[in-house]
Amino acid sequence: LVDFIHSESRLKFPEYRAPGSDKWQQISWEEAFDRIAKHIKEDRDANFIEKNADGVTVNRWLSTGMLCASASSNETGYLTQKFTRALGMLAVDNQARV
């Protein structure tokens, strides 16, 4: 992990590549988080299942999942699991299992 943190090739700022482009451009953290939040919200709004065919509340979001890092602490894993489940995600996995 220390090698990764101190690597000369480590990205220190978010970058964006427009569709069809072969060039990456540096963007601000605010823009990166806004873009991520926008895409997550659009996908969840379009694919969230509140009730199943029988009318039972299920609150599922099946089109997006979360892959967690294997180097995370148990506490981080617990919070990640709670966060993703609160959003309705069912597909949550950990890199350590792969």
Q: Which residues does each PLM region occupy?
A:
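N-terminal export/assembly segments and adjacent metallocofactor-ligating motifs
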Residues: 1-98
